[in-house]
Structure formats: structure tokens, C-alpha cells
Amino acid sequence: MSEEEVHDTSSEASEVFTNQPNAFVRGVRSIFGYRKTSLTLFVILTIVVTAGLSFYDNSLELTIELPTSQLEKEILESSWLDLQNIARYPHTYGSRANDQVHDYLEEIIQDMEYDNDGEKIMFESGKGVVSYYESNNLLVRVNGSDGTLPALLLSAHYDSVPSSFGVTDDGMGVASLLGVLRFVAHNQPRRTIIFNFNNNEEFGLFGAHAFVKHPWFKQVGYFLNLEGTGAGGKAVLFRGTDYGIVKNFGGVRYPYATSIFQQGFNNHVIHSETDYKVYKEAGLRGLDLAFYKPRDKYHTGEDNIRNVSPKSLWHMMSNAIDFVQMGVVDDSEEPAVYTTFLGYFFATPISALARVNLVLLVLFPVVSTPLLFVIVKYKKWKLRVTNFLGVPLAMGLAVAVGQVGNPMLVSSHPMMVVATTTSIVVLVYYVVLNGVDWVNTSSDQKLVTMIEVSFVYWVVLVYVTWSGGDHTGEFGVTVLFFVQASTSLLGLIGWTFTRVRGGDEPLLSGEEERYGTEDERDTEKPLVEHNYDWSLQYLLIVPVSSLVVYNSGWLVLEGVNKTVQESLASEHLIYWIVVVFSQFLVLPVVPFITKFNRYIVLGLSVVVVVGVLMSMAVHPFNQGSPMKLRFIERVGQNDMVEVYGRQGFVEDVLSDLPSVKQTQAKLECEALPDGLEVCKYKSGLTPGNLTVEVTTEPRAESYGLISGAITIAAPENRMCTVHFPPDRVKAVVVGKFGNNFKAIPDGFSREKGNYIYKDRNGISQLELYKLDWNKDYHVGFEWLPDIDDEGGMRVEVECFWGDMVPAYQEVVHYSPNWVTWANKERGLVGVVKHVDV
């Protein structure tokens, strides 16, 4: 080798060495270059941060602090003791324990201005159903310093269902009211506060209905209702009547809220109701604050003091204490959109969000369409129809195959079900989009996918905006569309500023300078790992979108996943929620999904295999997440115990009961609509001396209508129901009334101490609730005879008792630990009598 050659070689080596980037540049390239390893790092960090922030945001232990001031410490200690005393026994309206709770509360408030409400009301509580109710609410009034302000009503109910100790539903609400009462006794509020410790909420919201008829109701302008539909945890702002009152919730110390649950009520996804409904319909403005999970312990013996903590009680109580100190309320009565994150509260009127949505829906298509035209026409961005087939094809396939086989598993293992479904969805997108990427030679298929995902969000946002005020929980779609469409728009703008090289000059290569990440298979394009636009796109889209979807979706799923066992319709709804949740979890990362490395794909495949195997092998219920069965014993011509639940579970539970095996009682199971079944058996465990005697009184006829009356004698009883043939009875009266129904106006009326209700469309059921345990019911009615009978009518009377009965004690004691029990009717035992009038 000559000296010149040696010199040239050493010069080239020196030039290569000097052109090597330094360590910092190499580090930046290794992290932010569009490499599979870099993307894997970003994805893992996103999962960890999203799950961590969501866990912290929803954690009771990490976000709520116990009181430090001496007064608040004493208030919490006293209220916790109150809760222990209130929830010592089940205390349904039809039990002696209910009276004990009433007397306990009355003793606490006796030194204040209070009223032992004795309202008697009668109203139509359902289609063809009339209810008569004798109230014993306890009302307390604390006068405020500014008498010009409308009063604030604080409400909670002190009854439970017969199958539950009523700790969360609604002992925590009652104890919180007592805590607020002690606080305002030391700190006079600005506005007058009226406390309604109401009774018999569970079977018809009767205590709230009674308060609406009370003279103090006229003072009230606003309300805060405290409830519980789970067993402990954090108390969430369920719903609010309007933006003006909702925004005051931002002043509490530990706000926790989402209007997603409000939409659930509005769209009838959540079927249970609270006193909020009565107060809102009566014209008041206010909030519903409630515990919301887990619903499998709701109305069961697991709603007990062991499953809650003082910190849960303090969360509800402290927010109530802060809320009662609110000032002037805004006049805005629009529906509110609201949420919290990391203790920060956000609320806006639905109209403001609708205006933002409309701007976004119009702005992005108007701006992006011309840009796309310019890029395709003048910047030589080669697009085919196949470029746009990937996302819709993958989305359809993912919906078709993305369900776990065991339909009940989501009740006990929601995280596993979501992880499995999401992994399936990711793998489907990975396979389909890689196939599309292989077929197409288009550069920046990633940007095409971003535009497609933006269009999906655009369609959803159109639906949300068009749906109006009932869709206050879908505010997250606005965020998802904004970040996705903005990033897509930036990508299009980047393309418009690229230079196109090429032409007829022979010295030009004919190549094009392209914007965006290139395809590795095109060796003439810049190296993929030296493109950094992807990292900006990822950071703009994925972290925010993932957090919004995960936090909202998980909150919803935790609130409703237990309802999968309530009906087939609920099962379908829950799995629809899981599929939608999984789809929206995956959509933000879809533009980058083709760059997933083999370790991510392998990990997702393992999750799918494990999830599918678990769905086949794992029992869907366990001690921590039990199945709820409903119980009623009916005593009459055929004394039977009836147990209701999902098909395929009830018979196995009952067949192992000692009374069933010893008496060789035959289990009669019957399929019911909506995936339910009822199993009946004769129990040798009698409920004791429960008697119902029904006597008839002479009937009379006037203008073709027949009137008659019955007397119901049911010792130690508070609850009975009279069933009439459909559409025949036109008027009912509680009390002793004459036969002149013709002069009575339609609807409710009261005459000579009698409570009368008239409905020409027909009354099929009369519910009776009284306070005197041994007083007889006197019921009169007027009916229209059938043409083919002699004017007689058969009436069914059923009276309920809420105290423990031997057959119920047996099923609780001997059933598997993956079963919990709730009442089917207003009592645990019902005595049925028939009488011909």
C-alpha cells in the first residue's frame, strides 16, 4: 500500500470517528428514536403511571386524612359510636329494632328544636299502586344567622332492609348527619339547616314523601342527601340537580365526584333510587352523595361494621360539614358536567361543554380537509383505499372475539377480564394493521391511523353532543377527540411544509423528502430510528387519553360489575361496558401498535391464554365477591320458601340445606325471564305465631259500582298489601268511610280522618304502612263488577314481617361462603290470605 493510500484510509477513519455523535446524542436517539425498544419503554411507563395515578386518586387510605382539630376528633368518635349502635341489628321498618333506632336518635336530639313528624300520607307510588304511610321521621332545625337565605335540607334514612345491618345503607349517612348536627351546634351556620332523619326509604322513599308534606318543607331551597349503595370506600357525588348547586361541591375538603354516575341514573342503567328523586321532583335543588361499591354486599349481612372504617365515615361527614357552609347559590339550573382528579374539582354547565364540542366538531374537519387535499395533490403522499381499511376491520374483529367465555367472572375478577379482553383487542389490531402495513408502501401509515382514530372520536362526539343533557358523563370524549385530532392536525401541517424533490432534471434522483416516520422496508428512505416526531405524537396522545379512559372506565366498572348477577340484561350491559372500555383503552396506542416488539406481543399472548384458562377453571364467585340470592318465605295455603337468583346456581345451594335433606323436600325450580330462576321448597322451620285475619263487611251498590270493606288483623305487624283484580277497583279508603264514593274527587282526598284515593283507570294494589303494631287495618274500596259474575271479587292480603325467621337463619348459616342473602320482598316472611268480598 502506498503512502497516499495509507493517508487516505486514515483520513476516512478519522472522519468517521469525528462524525460519531457524543454520548448525550446517542442517548437521546436511543430513547426517542422510533425503535421498538423505545416504544416498549414508553408503553410500560404509560401503564405504570396511569394505573398508579388512578389507584391513588380512588384510594380512601391515601387521599383522606383523619381530623386533627379537637372538635372534629370528638365529632368523629361520637358519630362512629352512633354508627355502631344504629347498626347493631337489622332495623327495617317492620321490625322492633327500627323503633329502637328511632328512640336512640330522638334521645340525642331532644335538647334541640325538633319535630317527631307524625304525617300520614297517601299517594300513587306506581302505576295502579296506591300507598298509605304513617311517618315517624325525626326533624331537627338549626336556625342560621341570615334568615333571608333559603334553608338547606340534610337527609338520610335510618331504616335498613331486613337482610342487612344497614351500616353503609344508610347508617353512615345518619351518623354523618349527627356529626354535622354537633358541628353546627358549636358553629352557627349562615343559612338555616333542617335535618331529616327519615324512615322507610327502602320500600318506597316514604320518609322523603312525608317530609314534602311537612310545614318545614316550605323553608327549604336546597338539599344534600346522604346515601349508600355499597359497603364503605369513598363517598362519591352521585348526581346534582344543576350546575348552580353542583359547583359548590368544589368547596369541600375531599371532593370525589363524577357525572358518569349521574348519566347512569338518567339513562336508567342504575335502577335503584334514593330520596334525591323525591326532593328533586318537589322542586328542590341539591346533591346526592353516596357510597357506591361493592354492590354484592349491598342489602346483605355483609353490610356490617366490619367492612367499613372511620375514615370512610369521615370522608362523607367532613364533606357534608363543608357543604353546609356554602354561601349564595348560583341561579344556573342547567345540567352539570363534573369530575375530580387528585382532589381537584371541575364543573361546567352542559351548554358550555356543548359549545366547545360544536367548535371542535366543525373546526377540525374544516382545517384538516384542505390540508389533506394539498398533501395528497401536491406533496405526493400516496394513499390507497387499503390504507384506511385497517382500523375499521380490526375494530370489528376485536368486538367479535374480545369477550371472555365465563359471563359471571367479571363480578369477582374484573381486572382479569379487562386485561384479557384488552390484550385480545391489542393483538387483533397488531395483526390486522401489520397486514395493512405490509400491503401498502405508503410512508407514515401511522398518521393515517391517527386520522382514522380521530374520525372515530368525531363520530362519538357528534352522538354525545346531539344527545344533550342526559349525557353529562361523556365529557371524556371531548378530551380524547381534542388530543387525537390536534396531533393529527400537527402531522398534516408537518406534511404541508415538506419540500418535494424531483422533476425532469437528469441530475435529480426523483426522490421525495417525506414528513413523518418512514417504513423500514424502503431502503431509500431515512433511517427509522432517526425520526423523532413519533415521540411527540405519543406524548401528546397516549398518556392523557389512557388516564382519562382508564380512570373513568375503571370507576364505572367497579360501580356496576356486581350487577352482572342480577339479570341477563345486566350481564349483556356489563360485557358491553368491558368491550367498549377495552376498545377505548387501546385506541390511543393504535397508531404505534405495529412497532410493538416481540416481548410485548408475547406478554399479551400469555395474558390471553391465562385469562381464557381462568375463565374456564375459576368459580365466578368467592367469599370476597359473593353471589347474592334473594329470600322470601310465604305462609298461606302452600307454605313455601322461595329463593331467587341467576339460573344454574340456586338449586346447588339449596340442595345442601339440612332441612331439605332431612325432610327430603322437593326443590321446584322454575326459569324466569331475563336469565333468572326461582326455587321453592317446603321448610320444616316455621316462622312462629304469625297470623293474619281478614273479615268482610256488608257491601252496597250505587250507580252500578259496588262498595265493600275488609278489616285486617295482623298482630305485631306494620306492613300489609292488598291485591285487587286488575282495573276493577276505582277507589280505596283507609279508615271507616261510608258508601258515597261518587262525591269524592279523583286523586287523594281526606274526609273525617279517612284517607281516600280515587283513580278511574283502576287500582290494582294498596300498600299499607302503620306505626301501631297491633292496630287493625280498615280498608274500604269501590269496584266495577264484571258482566259475567255476580258482583263478587276475590281480594288477596299479604302481610310482611321483617324480623329474622328460622328458615332464613338456616340459609345464611349453611350456604357456601360465596353466597350472600338479601330480601326479595319488604319482609323475610309474608303471610297470605284470600277473601271473597
Curated annotation (Swiss-Prot):
Show the GO MF annotations. metal ion binding; metalloexopeptidase activity
Query: In Gene Ontology terms, what is a biological process of this protein?
Result: proteolysis
Q: Which Gene3D superfamilies match?
A: Zn peptidases (3.40.630.10)
| Residue intervals annotated with topology Vacuolar | 58-355, 406-415, 468-474, 561-572, 620-837
Q: Provide the cofactor note recorded for this chain's UniProt entry.
A: Binds 2 Zn(2+) ions per subunit.
Signal peptide (residue range)? none
Q: Which residues bind Zn(2+) 1?
A: 157, 169, 227
Residue intervals annotated with topology Cytoplasmic: 1-36, 377-384, 437-446, 496-539, 594-598
Indicate where this protein resides in the cell: Vacuole membrane
Q: Which co-factors does it depend on?
A: Zn(2+)
Q: What is its EC number?
A: 3.4.-.-
Q: Where are the transmembrane segments?
A: 37-57, 356-376, 385-405, 416-436, 447-467, 475-495, 540-560, 573-593, 599-619
Annotated positions for site Transition state stabilizer: 298
Would you say which domain of life the source belongs to? Eukaryota
This chain's function reads:
May be involved in vacuolar sorting and osmoregulation.
What is the name listed in the Swiss-Prot or TrEMBL entry for this protein? Answer: Vacuolar membrane protease
State the organism named in the record: Candida albicans (strain SC5314 / ATCC MYA-2876)
Species classification = Eukaryota, Fungi, Dikarya, Ascomycota, Saccharomycotina
